[in-house]
C-alpha cells in the first residue's frame, strides 16, 4: 500500500513538472497576431491575416515545424488604433504559450506596442510599419536593431530613395503633404534629404493632415500659393484619394508623386479616373517578370482566395499593392517559422539567433539576408516608381524609367 502511494506520488510530481515546463502544452507551435482586421484601413490587416493563414496551412500540410503543427492561437483586431493595439499586445504577451508575434499594420499602433514587445523578448515580426525606429531605435538602418524585432516593411528611408531621386530629376518646386503620424513625419525628413542628395531643391512648402481627414482644402491651397510644380505625398490610400480630389476641385493641375499607399485599391476606389497620371513608389515584386517564389505565392493565393479585393481588378495578374498588404505578412510568417525550424527550439534566444543566420531566403517580396545588425529585409534595389496610365481603355500601372 505504501509502495503504491509512493509510486503514485512520484508520477504526479513528474506530471506536474512536465506541465509546468510546458511539455504537455506544447503540442502545437502557437503564434499571436494583432492587426487591422476591420475598420477604414483593413486592407492591410485583413490582407496580412489571409497571408499568415496561407503560410500556416502550407507548413502544416508538410507536417508543421519539426513534427509540430502551427496554430494562430490569438488573432486580434486593433483597427489600426494604438490603444486597441496596446490592449491586444498585453493579452498576447500574457499568453506564455505564444512563441512568436506578428505585429500591427501601421506605424502608430506599432510604436505604441514595440517597447513592451521588445522587453518581453519573444520574436516579433513587423510586416508593415514603415518608420525605421520600429526596428532601429537609433533611426539608423543597419545599426543596433531591437534584439527581437525583424522588419518586412518598406521602410520610409528606403522608399524615400526612389521617390526622392525621381522628384529631384523632374521638378524644381516641390511641395510635400504628409500624414501626421510617425510614418509621415519621419518620411518628410527622409524624402527632403533624398531630394537634395540627388541634386534637387529643398521642398518649397510642407503641410500635414490627420489620418481619416475628409477635407484637404487648406493644405492644397497652401501648395497652390507656393506655386509648386509637383506635390509629393506620404500617406495611406483613402487619404491620398481625398488629396487628389481636392487638387482637382481647386484646379491644381500638377503631378502627384506619392508613397506606396497610392498604388492600392483604396486610392483607386476613392480617386476614380483621377488616378491617371499619379505616380507612386512600390516594391516591384509583382511586376513582370515575377521571380519563381512570387509566382508560386500568387498561384497559391488565387487558389485559396480567388481574385478578391486584395488580388485586384485583373483576374490574370495580382496588383502591385499585394506586396505591402499581403505578401509582407506571408514573408514575415515564413521567416518566423523557418527560424523555429532551424533552431529546433521554441526558446526566444534560439529562434532569434536562427533568424539572424538566415541568408539567401527566397521570399515573395525579396531575397532575405539577416544578421545580428541587419534586421530588415527590403532594400532600395527592390523599389520602383510606377505611373497610372490608360491602355486599351483600361487604367493600369506601369514602371517608369528613372
Locations of regions flagged by a protein language model:
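Cleavable N-terminal signal peptides
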Residues: 11-14, 24
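Extracellular/periplasmic Venus flytrap/periplasmic-binding protein
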Residues: 87, 132, 139-251, 269, ...
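Extracellular/periplasmic periplasmic-binding protein-like sensory domains
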Residues: 247-330, 384, 388-389, 395-400
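Beta-alpha junction/loop-to-helix N-cap segments that form part of ligand/metal-binding clefts
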Residues: 43-50, 62-139, 152, 209-216, ...
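Extracytoplasmic "Venus flytrap"
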Residues: 32-53, 75-83, 105-106, 177-185, ...
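Segments of small-molecule ligand-sensing domains
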Residues: 306, 310-398, 402
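Bacterial N-terminal signal peptides that target proteins for export
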Residues: 1-11
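Sec/Tat signal peptide C-region and signal peptidase I cleavage site
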Residues: 19-26
Amino acid at each position: 500500500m505504501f509502495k503504491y502511494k509512493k509510486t503514485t506520488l512520484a508520477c504526479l510530481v513528474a506530471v506536474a513538472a512536465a506541465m509546468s515546463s510546458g511539455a504537455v502544452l506544447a503540442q502545437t507551435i502557437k503564434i499571436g497576431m494583432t492587426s487591422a482586421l476591420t475598420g477604414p484601413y483593413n486592407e492591410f490587416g485583413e490582407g496580412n491575416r489571409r497571408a499568415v493563414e496561407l503560410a500556416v496551412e502550407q507548413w502544416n500540410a508538410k507536417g508543421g515545424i519539426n513534427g509540430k503543427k502551427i496554430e494562430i492561437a490569438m488573432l486580434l483586431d486593433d483597427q489600426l488604433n494604438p490603444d486597441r493595439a496596446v490592449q491586444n499586445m498585453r493579452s498576447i504577451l500574457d499568453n506564455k504559450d505564444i512563441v512568436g508575434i506578428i505585429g500591427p499594420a501601421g506605424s502608430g499602433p506599432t510604436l505604441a506596442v514595440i517597447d513592451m514587445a521588445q522587453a518581453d523578448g519573444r520574436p516579433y515580426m513587423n510586416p508593415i510599419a514603415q518608420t525605421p525606429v520600429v526596428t532601429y531605435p537609433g533611426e539608423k538602418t543597419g545599426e543596433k536593431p531591437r534584439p527581437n524585432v525583424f522588419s518586412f516593411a518598406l521602410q520610409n528611408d528606403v522608399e524615400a530613395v526612389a521617390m526622392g531621386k525621381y522628384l529631384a530629376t523632374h521638378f524644381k518646386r516641390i511641395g510635400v503633404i504628409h500624414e501626421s503620424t510617425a510614418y509621415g513625419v519621419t518620411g518628410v525628413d527622409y524624402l527632403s534629404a533624398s531630394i537634395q542628395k540627388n541634386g534637387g531643391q529643398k521642398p518649397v512648402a510642407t503641410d500635414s493632415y490627420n489620418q481619416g481627414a475628409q477635407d484637404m482644402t487648406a493644405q492644397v491651397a497652401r501648395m497652390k500659393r507656393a506655386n509648386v510644380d509637383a506635390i509629393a505625398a506620404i500617406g495611406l490610400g483613402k487619404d491620398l484619394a481625398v488629396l487628389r480630389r481636392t487638387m482637382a476641385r481647386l484646379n491644381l493641375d500638377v503631378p502627384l508623386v506619392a508613397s506606396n499607399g497610392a498604388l492600392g485599391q483604396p486610392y483607386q476606389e476613392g480617386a476614380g479616373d483621377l488616378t491617371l497620371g499619379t505616380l507612386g513608389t512600390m516594391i516591384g515584386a509583382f511586376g513582370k517578370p515575377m521571380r519563381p517564389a512570387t509566382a508560386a505565392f500568387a498561384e497559391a493565393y488565387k487558389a485559396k482566395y480567388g481574385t478578391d479585393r486584395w488580388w485586384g481588378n485583373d483576374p490574370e495578374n495580382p496588383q502591385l499593392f499585394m506586396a505591402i498588404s499581403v505578401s509582407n505578412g506571408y514573408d514575415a510568417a515564413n521567416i518566423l517559422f523557418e527560424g523555429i525550424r532551424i533552431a529546433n527550439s521554441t526558446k526566444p534566444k534560439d529562434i532569434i539567433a536562427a533568424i539572424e543566420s538566415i541568408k539567401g531566403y527566397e521570399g515573395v517580396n525579396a531575397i532575405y539576408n539577416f544578421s545580428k545588425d541587419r534586421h530588415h529585409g527590403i532594400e532600395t534595389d527592390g523599389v520602383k516608381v510606377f505611373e497610372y496610365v490608360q491602355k486599351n481603355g483600361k487604367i493600369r500601372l506601369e514602371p517608369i524609367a528613372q
